[in-house]
Amino acid sequence: MRHRLRAAPQIAVLIGGLHPQIKKKVRSALERILSNPLCGKALKDELDGLRSFPVGRFRIVYRIAAGRVVELVAIGSRERIYEETYRLITKKPTLPGP
């Protein structure tokens, strides 16, 4: 039985704004995750309990929740996704750039 997807509205907007080829790859990756949520890499330390799935230069970060639900936490470029995810789960504000 397939899992259900839960995502914050801002993640849906982010996916909608991606380049069509990347959007197609993200949707394909989400289908794979929903079919087998353990397919992503288990994260450690501060991100324990989350998983990451690669989509080219991007990463999908998610958690497996109760009731056969996969919760999307973040989607973004590999370079910044883990610090952004940490900020989101600890609700720390983004510092302004120089």
Which residues are covered by each model-predicted region?
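Arg/Lys-rich, positively charged N-terminal/basic patches that mediate binding to nucleic acids
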Residues: 1-25, 29, 98
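Generic detector of well-ordered alpha-helical segments enriched in charged/polar residues
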Residues: 12, 27, 44, 82-87
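Context-gated lysine
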Residues: 23-25, 41-44, 91-92
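Short proline/glycine- and basic residue-enriched helix-capping loop/turn segments at helix->loop/beta transitions
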Residues: 32-37
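Basic/aromatic recognition patch in beta-strand/loop cores that engages polyanionic ligands
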Residues: 38-82
